[in-house]
Amino acid sequence: MSKVFVIILVALMVAISIASAHRPPPNPRCLPGHSKCKYEPKKNSCCLGFQCTERNQCELVYPGHHGKPCGKDNLLGCILPPPTFKPRPCGKYNLKGCKPIRPRPHPHH
């Protein structure tokens, strides 16, 4: 029983190594910090999953749950804070889905 399992495992590893050897080399624009790009707001000259920052470099974007808040440096591939969640203070990086916080009256001593 265990010998069959080992043979299947080895066959899988060999198949994976052959498949990965035929993959084309990664696009230099897909490597964070290595590729130069022209920064243009709302445009993306980098490959999918990357974005061009103001430093004219392609930076990795984390999609979905791990997305960075939207802001000056992150127009593409960013997530807006959900408005149903805790209200967050308005700021440079949080223009949508935020609520202005009213100053609380301090109790007098």
From Swiss-Prot:
Coiled coil: none annotated. Disulfide bonds join C30-C47, C37-C52, C46-C58, C70-C90, C78-C98. The presence of a 'disulfide through disulfide knot' structurally defines this protein as a knottin. Residues 1-21 form the signal peptide. GO terms for cellular component: extracellular region. Its main location: secreted. Expressed by the venom gland. The keyword Iron does not apply. Keywords: Disulfide bond, Knottin, Secreted, Signal. It is found in: Secreted. This is Cysteine-rich venom protein 7.
